[in-house]
């Protein structure tokens, strides 16, 4: 229960950042936070998505999903480290 509440706190913090700073600045934050990413586990499915850096993640998810889903995916990765 504590891990779930911690995840909700992080999620709400990032939604506040979305509303205050805007999309471009947050993409810059993502690139700084996640320099390298290799594998993801998401929604009980195993996706072998290999990216060289966070810029590939941002480009991929801005094409495939809306910005909220992209944010949730990045949050899930940060939570699972």
Swiss-Prot record:
Keywords in alphabetical order: Membrane, Transmembrane, Transmembrane helix
Membrane spanning residue stretches: 1-21, 27-47
Subcellular location: Membrane
GO cellular component, one term: membrane
Membrane topology: Multi-pass membrane protein
Main location: membrane
Domain of life: Eukaryota
Protein name stated in the entry: Putative uncharacterized protein YDR406W-A
Native organism: Saccharomyces cerevisiae (strain ATCC 204508 / S288c) (Baker's yeast)
């Amino acid at each position: 229960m504590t891990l779930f509440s911690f995840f909700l706190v992080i999620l709400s913090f990032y939604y506040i950042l979305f509303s205050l700073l805007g999309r471009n600045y947050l993409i810059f934050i993502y690139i700084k936070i996640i320099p390298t990413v290799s594998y993801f586990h998401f929604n009980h499915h195993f996706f072998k998505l290999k990216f060289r850096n966070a810029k590939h993640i941002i480009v991929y998810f801005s094409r495939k999903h809306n910005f909220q889903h992209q944010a949730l995916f990045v949050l899930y990765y940060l939570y699972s480290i």
